[in-house]
Design a protein with these regions (language model features):
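Interhelical loop and helix-boundary elements at the membrane-water interface
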Residues: 2-154, 165-203
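Transmembrane helix-loop junctions at the membrane interface of multipass transporters and ion channels
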Residues: 158-164
Length: 203
C-alpha cells in the first residue's frame, strides 16, 4: 500500500483523480463570479447605486464606483458567460459533470453567482466607507474575499445547483482551491484593468 494511503485511508487510488478533478471544476463553475466585477468596471458609469447619499458619519453609503450600470452589466456578463461555457456540454455531453445544467439553469445559476459577487463587493464598499477608507483604498482580505463570500452565499438560493458544485463531498476541495487562488487572481485582474485604464489603482 502506498504511504499516502495510511494517511488518507478513505481515498482509494481510483477516487483520487476524481477528487482532484473537483478543483478545476469548482474554478470552472465559479468563473461567472470571477468575471462579474471586471465586467462591472467595463460597463460601469452613470448614476451611483447610493444616488450620492451619505450616512450620519459623513461618508458615502457605497461611493461613485458602484453604479446601476455596473451591477446590471456585470450580472448579465456573468450569466451569459455561464451559458456559453455550458452550451458545448449541452450539445455533446449533457450528462457531463462539467455542465452548468440546461440552458435556463445555466443562465439563472450564473446570474445568481454574478449578482452575489457584486452584492458582496457592495457590502465590502459599505464596510470600507464606514472605516473612512476612500474609494480605491486597500483593505486586505476584504478586497479579495467580499465577492467570493457574496457569490457563495447567494448561490445557496439554488441549493440543488450550488451544493454539489461547492459545498459537499469532493467539491469542498474545489471550494478550498477558490479560496487559495482568489488573491492572486484578483491581483492579476486588477493589474490588467489598471494597464487598460479601467482602474485607478493596480490592486
Amino acid at each position: 500500500m502506498p504511504p499516502w494511503q495510511y494517511l488518507y485511508p478513505r481515498i482509494s487510488p481510483s477516487a483520487a483523480p476524481v477528487a482532484l478533478e473537483a478543483i478545476p471544476q469548482a474554478l470552472w463553475f465559479f468563473l461567472p463570479a470571477f468575471i462579474a466585477n471586471p465586467m462591472a468596471v467595463v460597463f460601469g458609469g452613470g448614476p451611483p447605486i447610493d444616488l450620492g447619499r451619505s450616512l450620519s458619519d459623513g461618508q458615502r453609503i457605497f461611493g461613485d464606483g458602484k453604479t446601476w450600470r455596473g451591477l446590471v452589466g456585470g450580472t448579465l456578463a456573468g450569466a451569459i458567460l455561464g451559458l456559453l461555457l455550458s452550451l458545448p456540454f449541452d450539445l455533446l455531453a449533457p450528462s457531463s459533470s462539467w455542465s452548468f445544467g440546461p440552458p435556463a439553469v445555466a443562465f439563472v445559476a450564473s446570474a445568481v453567482l454574478s449578482l452575489g459577487a457584486l452584492l458582496g463587493d457592495l457590502v465590502g464598499a459599505f464596510v470600507k466607507r464606514r472605516m473612512h477608507l476612500p474609494r480605491g483604498a486597500k483593505a486586505s482580505g476584504l478586497d479579495q474575499y467580499d465577492f467570493v463570500v457574496g457569490a457563495l452565499f447567494l448561490s445557496l438560493a439554488i441549493p440543488s445547483w450550488s451544493v454539489p458544485r461547492f459545498f459537499s463531498g469532493d467539491a469542498l476541495l474545489g471550494l478550498l482551491a477558490i479560496i487559495v487562488i482568489t488573491p492572486a487572481l484578483h491581483r492579476a485582474v486588477n493589474l490588467v484593468g489598471y494597464r487598460m485604464g479601467k482602474k485607478h489603482e493596480p490592486w
